[in-house]
Amino acid sequence: PSDALASTANYLAEFGWTNNQPWGIEVNLPENFNYRNADLEVKATPARWSELGLKTITGEKIPNYGEGSVFLPAGAKGPAFIVFNNFFVIKRYNNANSYAMAVGHLSDRILGGKSFHIEWPRGPGALKFNEKVELQNLLNQLGYDVGEADGIIGPNSIAAIRKFQISVGLIPDGMSNKDLLLKMRASN
C-alpha cells in the first residue's frame, strides 16, 4: 500500500500538483449567474469570478489559488464549486469529474474539512446507459450534433444539452437526467 501511495503521489507531482492549494472550493452563485460559464473549459481568475458575483459558501471573496472553473456536478440545483489546478491534476490520473471531486473531497474530510454546505438534489435521478444513448440520439435528431451516440455524456453531449436547454427556456447547466429526457421526448 505505501508503494502505491508513493507512486500516486509522484504521478500527481509530475503532472503539476500544487501543495497547500485546494482542488476546489464550494461557492455561492449570484441569482443572475450566466450558466454558460459553468464549464470546465471556461477559466478565470478568482478576481474575475468575484466581479461576476461569486463568493465562497461563507460569503467571502474567492481566494487566489490561480485560475479556476465553475463546476456544477449536480446541475443548477446542487452545490457549486470553483475548481483549481489540483482538480485537473487529479483528472490526469483518472479523467472522470466524479472521481476528481470524490478524491478531492475525501482528502478535505481526512484533513478535518466539513461536508458540502448545499445538499445534493434529490430528484429525477441519473440516466441508465440506454437512456443516455436515447438522449444522444434525440439530440442528434433535433439538430444538436453530439456525434455517435455512445452513452457517454462528454463535452459534446453537454454542449448539445446546453443548446437544447436554452431553446426550451431551461437553465443551461448541461445536466442530463430523467426530466430532461422526458422533455426531449416531448420535443421530438
Describe the residue ranges of each PLM region.
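Short acidic, glycine/serine/threonine-rich helix-capping segments at coil-helix boundaries
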Residues: 127-132, 140-184
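Extracytoplasmic and endomembrane cell-envelope/extracellular-matrix remodeling and assembly machinery
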Residues: 1-137, 141-144
